[in-house]
Curated annotation (Swiss-Prot):
It is found in: Membrane. It comes from Xenopus tropicalis (Western clawed frog). It holds the Pfam family DUF4149. Its main location: membrane. The keyword Membrane applies. This is Transmembrane protein 205. Belongs to the TMEM205 family. The chain crosses the membrane at residues 18-38, 53-73, 89-109, 168-188. Keywords: Membrane, Transmembrane, Transmembrane helix. GO terms for cellular component: membrane.
């Protein structure tokens, strides 16, 4: 099923649109939407919004990563890859792997843990402050006096950190692949 050679204008256009749409969505979600939202709505509302949007976001990135890798692999047989093409296909594969782990494992665990934390926080009248620094002392006291909450917070931070790293890895891989594609364009 390898289709070595010129993919044609339609396939090239689809490949570029999928990759650039994914990268643009990643940039917006990573560097704009979250920061604006956390500064503008209560903490639990922020978590609820993210719990609704992120599954779609994560699976769209996963689908785009799969399509990008599939198109690239179809027109670049492994036996004929140049060193730069080997790097590019590796970036597509790493992005797909990170997107899959993010969408199917790390993000859902982060969300489930967050909702468990919300239950405890509501019992202590927390979660309605706007911004990450709202009621910081109250959250600290809650961690100190409630070992279950402290354990949940540690789990949340661990999975949120790994989830964020997967997201950044995808963003960097897609950005690098866009640079590769731009450098190969004969003209604008």
């Amino acid at each position: 099923m390898v289709a070595e050679g010129d993919p044609g204008n339609l396939v090239r256009t689809i490949h570029l649109l999928v990759l650039s749409a994914s990268w643009g969505m990643q940039c917006w979600t990573t560097f704009v939407a979250g920061f604006v939202l956390i500064r503008g709505v209560p903490r639990h509302t922020f978590g609820l919004v993210q719990s609704k949007l992120f599954p779609f976001y994560n699976h769209i990135v996963l689908c785009c990563s799969f399509i990008s890798l599939a198109i690239y692999a179809a027109y670049h047989p492994r036996e004929l890859l140049s060193p730069s093409e080997s790097v590019q296909i590796t970036l597509f594969f790493v992005c797909l792997l990170a997107a899959a782990l993010h969408a199917r494992w790390f993000s859902p665990v982060t969300t489930k843990t967050m909702f468990k934390m919300h239950i405890i926080e509501r019992e202590h009248s927390l979660g309605q402050g706007v911004g990450l620094s709202a009621n910081r002392e109250a959250y600290q006291r809650l961690q100190e006096k409630d070992p279950k909450y402290k354990a949940l917070r540690q789990r949340f931070m661990r999975y949120h950190g790994i989830s964020s790293l997967c997201n950044l890895l995808c963003l960097l891989c897609n950005g690098a692949n866009l640079v590769y594609m731009a450098l190969l364009m004969p003209t604008l």
